[in-house]
Amino acid sequence: MFQGASALTLDAKGRMSVPSRYREALQGQAEGRVTVTKHPDGCLLLFPRPEWEVFRAKIAALPMDAHWWRRIFLGNAMDVDLDSAGRILVSPELRMAAGLEKEVMLLGMGSHFELWDSQTYIAKEQAAMAQGMPDALKNFTF
């Protein structure tokens, strides 16, 4: 289970150091193998490989009228491995698609991660909070 936010920096080659609190879980759960793909909100999705296989099967089973979404998720997916320093390489194509340059935010979302450009994430979070809670959360207690 992945949760929490981490402010990180991409190096000049597009590598991101995975926070140590996640490395052991990624090694145990996925032998350090992850899959990175596009997210429709403008960030990237990072899945441990076993979770990716579950997601990929769901996407592959979508009806034909969702063929562009299959292309977006599956056609842009890249398999990467944690290197010996605990880093993953984010491809130039995926970095460009998500507007990632240097400062990024890694969010643990349970079974997977989202990777955002830091400024984009801050702006989208502020906009969401300004709109208030959606109806689905109106009766949710904290």
Curated annotation (Swiss-Prot):
PANTHER family from the UniProt entry: TRANSCRIPTIONAL REGULATOR MRAZ (PTHR34701:SF1)
Residue ranges constituting the SpoVT-AbrB domain according to the UniProt record: 5-51, 77-120
Keywords: Cytoplasm, DNA-binding, Repeat, Transcription, Transcription regulation
GO molecular function terms attached to this record: DNA-binding transcription factor activity; transcription cis-regulatory region binding
Subunit structure of this chain's protein: Forms oligomers.
The protein's name in its UniProt record: Transcriptional regulator MraZ
SUPFAM superfamilies: AbrB/MazE/MraZ-like (SSF89447)
Entry similarity comment: Belongs to the MraZ family.
Keyword Plastid in annotation: no
Superkingdom, taxonomy of origin: Bacteria
GO BP, sorted A to Z: negative regulation of DNA-templated transcription initiation
Gene Ontology cellular component terms for the protein in this record: cytoplasm; nucleoid
Subcellular localization: Cytoplasm, Nucleoid
